[in-house]
Amino acid sequence: MLAIRLVHLIEKHSDALSRGLAVEIRKSDRTSDFRKIPPDELKLAATEVYRKLGEWLLQKTESDIAGRFKVIAQQRAAEGISLHQFVWALMLTRDHLWKFLRREAFADTAVELHGELELHQLLNQFFDRAVYYAIVGYEQAEQPGPPTNELLRARDLAISIGLMEERGATRDIIEE
């Protein structure tokens, strides 16, 4: 129960948390690549996590987390954000939450302490998965995809008019 109250506290303060996190990410030397991203876009990305934290922790499946963080990672990779800096930004996002909770919510009883520990476990589990799937997303962004139908049609046309030999065409497409 207390964990849910703490999540609601985070969601209620999501705008202020997001602003603070965006500033922290832009100032950190470990996340200097993020200076390429407009501040409002950084704040919006943080707000997405903070404002819907309850959903992410309690309702979203691992598949939901995988899908979202792979896409975000691929987008950041395309924007030139290095993987280690993206992972550090995720760690800053988690740590920023903990600083906020230490300021705003202190456990006075064993039950409250249990609630804080429960939230700590849920947050760590969420961010561990976010980091894992972000790395998967970066790896997928680096791998060339399979030949498209257009490439295959072009290859077939080149073979049919004698510009390519069938055997070499397959190897050329695979190597590219």
Q: What spans do the regions from the language model cover?
A:
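Long, amphipathic alpha-helical coupling/dimerization segments that relay conformational signals between
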Residues: L2, L6, E62-E175
